[in-house]
Amino acid sequence: MKAVILAGGLGTRLSEETIVKPKPMVEIGGKPILWHIMKMYSVHGIKDFIICCGYKGYVIKEYFANYFLHMSDVTFHMAENRMEVHHKRVEPWNVTLVDTGDSSMTGGRLKRVAEYVKDDEAFLFTYGDGVADLDIKATIDFHKAHGKKATLTATFPPGRFGALDIQAGQVRSFQEKPKGDGAMINGGFFVLNPSVIDLIDNDATTWEQEPLMTLAQQGELMAFEHPGFWQPMDTLRDKVYLEGLWEKGKAPWKTWE
């Protein structure tokens, strides 16, 4: 099964970083968050990726074109015009990079890659700026079992601030970012049948609006509930939080070795 990843947005709330790179190339632990997302899928056997490029898409192309350089130690023999790669690291991935336009909306980007998934029974779809400890295989099995056109992952949004456990005026413990108000939201990890792309009109279509609402009205949208870790990287605060988890060795989304 293929995974389509949106990677063309501006990331204006991370402008400190995105002035020189697209948002999915902002790094967590020295690796682009796009890489983390692909590793999340890869550990569940997903090897074929379609990346919807847009704003500064050349940065993503350069990264994959020189992937082994980014991931390996290298010696440059300058006088001999020769390069030696040490402990070459590779991934078992097939990565298709598609220019989906600088200003296309989320639905428009998906429509532009329709030819790459049209013959598949179903495909995975997500955004290039969020991580989770989601059981990808379970979402696929859920989608196949219910027989509807679309599955979204429903999750609890993280709280913005840590919480205090106070008993009789005494602080007993701290909780890092407890869950939000109890209502589940669209977590942005989808399993879709190719026919859903017919609901997208053009580049100006936002996937989260008319297409998803139409699927819901038709009774063709199911929710896979994920109560575990989920965190988007919308702001610098989010990036710092994710970076901290990674550096402490407590990144829940890291389910690979």
UniProtKB/Swiss-Prot annotation:
Q: Which UniProt keywords apply?
A: Lipopolysaccharide biosynthesis, Magnesium, Metal-binding, Nucleotide-binding, Nucleotidyltransferase, Transferase
Per UniProt, the cofactor note for this protein states: Binds 1 Mg(2+) ion per subunit.
Stated family? Belongs to the glucose-1-phosphate cytidylyltransferase family.
KW Nucleotidyltransferase (keyword) present: yes
Binding-site list for substrate:
6-13, 23, 104, 109, 128
Name of the featured protein: Glucose-1-phosphate cytidylyltransferase
User: Matching NCBIfam families, A to Z?
Assistant: G1P_cyt_trans
Q: Please give the InterPro entries that the UniProt record associates with this protein.
A: G1P_cyt_trans (IPR046981), G1P_cyt_trans-like (IPR013446), NTP_transferase_dom (IPR005835), Nucleotide-diphossugar_trans (IPR029044)
State the protein's purpose: Involved in the biosynthesis of the tyvelose, a 3,6-dideoxyhexose found in the O-antigen of the surface lipopolysaccharides. It catalyzes the transfer of a CMP moiety from CTP to glucose 1-phosphate. This enzyme can utilize either CTP or UTP as the nucleotide donor.
Q: Record-annotated residues binding Mg(2+)?
A: 129, 234
User: What is its EC class?
Assistant: transferase
Cross-referenced SUPFAM superfamilies? Nucleotide-diphospho-sugar transferases (SSF53448)
Gene encoding the protein: rfbF
> For this protein, what is any one GO molecular function term?
nucleotide binding
User: What domain of life?
Assistant: Bacteria
Q: Which reaction does it catalyse?
A: alpha-D-glucose 1-phosphate + CTP + H(+) = CDP-D-glucose + diphosphate
Organism name: Salmonella typhi
One of this protein's Pfam families, by short name? NTP_transferase
Pathway it works in: Nucleotide-sugar biosynthesis; CDP-3,6-dideoxy-D-mannose biosynthesis; CDP-3,6-dideoxy-D-mannose from CTP and alpha-D-glucose 1-phosphate: step 1/5; Bacterial outer membrane biogenesis; LPS O-antigen biosynthesis
Assembly and oligomerization:
Homohexamer.
**Which biological process, per GO, is one annotated for this protein?**
O antigen biosynthetic process
**Which EC number(s) are documented for this chain?**
2.7.7.33
Establish whether keyword Transferase is in the entry.
yes
Q: What else is known?
A: Catalysis proceeds via a sequential rather than a ping-pong bi-bi reaction mechanism.
Which cofactors is this protein said to need?
Answer: Mg(2+)
